[in-house]
Amino acid sequence: MAEKEATVYIVDVGKSMGEKRNGRSMTDLEWAMQYVWDCITATVATGRKTATIGVIGLKTDETSNELDDDPHFKHISVFTEIQQFLMPDIRRLGALVKPSETDKGDAISAIILAIQMIVTYCKKLKYKRKIVLVTNGQGWMSNEDLDQITKKIKEDNIDLVVLGTDFDDPEYGFKEEGKDPRKAENEALLRGLVEDCNGAFGTLEQAVSEMDIPRAKRVRTVATFKGFLQLGNPEEYDTALRIPVERYYRTYVAKPPSASSFVLRSDVGAEGEQGESSQLPKSPPEGGALTSVRNLRTYEVPDENAPGGKFDVEREELAKGYEYGRTAVHISETDENITTLETYAALELVGFIQTDKYDRYMHMSTTNIIIGQRGNDKASLALSSFIHALFELECYAVARLVVKENKPPVMVLLAPSIEPDYECLLEVQLPFAEDVRTYRFPPLDKVITVSGKVVTEHRNLPNKDLLDAMSEYVDSMELVDTDETGNPVEGLPIDDSFSPVLHRIDSAIRYRAIHPDDPVLPPSKNLTKLSQPPQDLVEKSKAYLQKLMEAADVKKVPPKVKGRKRIRESEKPLSGLDVDALLHQEKRARISPTNAIPEFKQTLTQAETIETIKDAVKQMTSIIEDQIKNSLGDANYDRVIEEMGVMREELISFEEPALYNDFLRQLKDKLLKEELGGDRRELWWLLRRSQLGLINQRESDQSDVTEEQAKEVSLRCHLSSRGIY
């Protein structure tokens, strides 16, 4: 179970916090709230009820706290009591955090109030307590009873963090020039208090700069298996080995938050929901005009005698079936129990394998660790002996794992892991024989002819110069750095490598929670730095890359020729032969309805004038209309859609969109007037679904149809008889 947390943020909202200083484009309050919002949204994103937050406003115009009778606590307001923070709380807090019209208010008194809030809320329970003060250090601060404050903070194990705008921090390397004497005095006062409490004192610039570094989420792992590591059957043999062990995740895939579906809330839907329960509130819930999408699943069975040809059945009346090919095979519960393998939870050793005989590609899962039962020294000692035996013999163990009774067994590999203060078994899943697929690929260093001859020099094989050039280029791109003494160090430490998807989505969600109307900021450089090689390596390897390009005879592909397709020079084959000339292909005059698409393309390819293209379109129009007119129901609809799609694509390529647009307008007019074999409005719905509308200016520069005009000539048609819209 996660630790309980209680954090109180004290935010200085004084008049001076609304000013811009030291060349910054934002006020001190906006700058400070970047850090506060980042901390609050990170806590809200966890969704934990045990992670609670309280917020106090310092130097507010009014006073609102339980100690407001004392003059020391004037101009201090409790914005939010300690509680679990949710989205509505973030919205309310955003409206409260504004610069005030005064600089009166004691930061030390605000810390005392925060201590009082934590003591009242946490009582004597086990909590992780924390107070964060963000201020610019202006105004008056009391230095009375600092010893008592320090004593109380230590007694209750409260972490005190003080961050100041433009506070001096020698460790970070920042010092404000020309500092106001009152601010310097307040800085010294706060620094002394924090040091006496063993807290953290720093400048806000460092805290804001570290926000770009993604935070790895630390989770408290839970045992996925508790049982025995055994060798032999203990029920039959007294010599069987049994060691109580526990299994935990070593690595686990972190997944970003999944998307949720929402729809606009309607008054009709709200009234309908209220009619179902008289206990629902009449006022709209938090979240405004959106409501979540709820799925409703119904099961229907065909029945000619039922209204609509179907009748509904309850889920309880259905029988479970499995797909075998395209056939649904029913299996009763009795028969299904027979297919269930009866197993019991255990980790049974079945064999051993030398480390050099095992291939790493056999891994089929993330890694787990096996340790001795917690609190059982005898089990830990026995498992340690087994681990050292595997290590000394350079062996891995193969075991059969059943994590829970009647669960399917899996085969796992157990590898010893010995560190100075920690020993365990690393466990990874192995494939069954049915999981292994064997594929044969041609060799990369030779070519075997049909007759069996082995060829080592071939146009598809790299020669020695190319191999040497590639080797030198790869060596020049080595991602290894050196320290001051010249010793190699890891150039890409795993702790500095972050998942762009995971942390980008997380930061975007948290930013959108605070700024619902602003565009999301670009991703952090810490996430994008690995998307391209380091610039110094690129410059270093430039000469080797040029040598590699010369050895491989790399040539730049000419840009795609723009212009009308019919006046372009036809692409020449590598052989240099004109296939059409060799076959003496004659120019086509008529397009056959049985082979319309290939012959239409061929006619356009051979076209030398616009009249030839118009004639081909006219023939295709006649063929399409004839197929629609003679279609029995929707028998020819798929063919018509395919032909229209080809016509549309080809006329875009030949930059003649007007021919297609004129054809489409005429076709729509005939269909709506039922001149092509009756009611064919369903075809329009299919054309709309296939996106075969007018060619607009975005698709072709030669078109005179705008996107708005294309939408006006809508393909949507009301099919009331079929219930399709």
From Swiss-Prot:
Keyword RNA-binding appears in the UniProt entry: no
Transmembrane spans: none
Region feature Disordered, mapped onto this chain: 267-290
Domain of life of the organism encoding this protein: Eukaryota
A Gene Ontology cellular-component term: chromosome, telomeric region
Key words of the record: ATP-binding, Chromosome, DNA damage, DNA recombination, DNA repair, DNA-binding, Helicase, Hydrolase, Nucleotide-binding, Nucleus, Telomere
Subcellular location: Nucleus; Chromosome, Telomere
Molecular function, one GO term: ATP hydrolysis activity
EC top class named in words: hydrolase
Catalyses which reaction(s): ATP + H2O = ADP + phosphate + H(+)
Ku domain span: 229-476
Gene3D superfamilies xrefs: 1.10.1600.10, 2.40.290.10, Ku, C-terminal domain, von Willebrand factor, type A domain
Alphabetical list of Pfam families matching this protein: Ku, Ku_N, Ku_PK_bind
Xref: SMART domains: Ku78
Keyword Ribonucleoprotein set for record: no
EC number: 3.6.4.12
BP-aspect Gene Ontology terms: DNA recombination; double-strand break repair via nonhomologous end joining; telomere maintenance
Family classification: Belongs to the ku80 family.
Subunit-structure text: Heterodimer of Ku70 and Ku80.
Its biological purpose: Single-stranded DNA-dependent ATP-dependent helicase. Involved in non-homologous end joining (NHEJ) DNA double strand break repair. DNA-binding is sequence-independent but has a high affinity to nicks in double-stranded DNA and to the ends of duplex DNA. Binds to naturally occurring chromosomal ends, and therefore provides chromosomal end protection. Required also for telomere recombination to repair telomeric ends in the absence of telomerase. ku70, of the ku70/ku80 heterodimer, binds to the stem loop of tlc1, the RNA component of telomerase. Involved in telomere maintenance.
Protein name (Swiss-Prot/TrEMBL): ATP-dependent DNA helicase II subunit 2
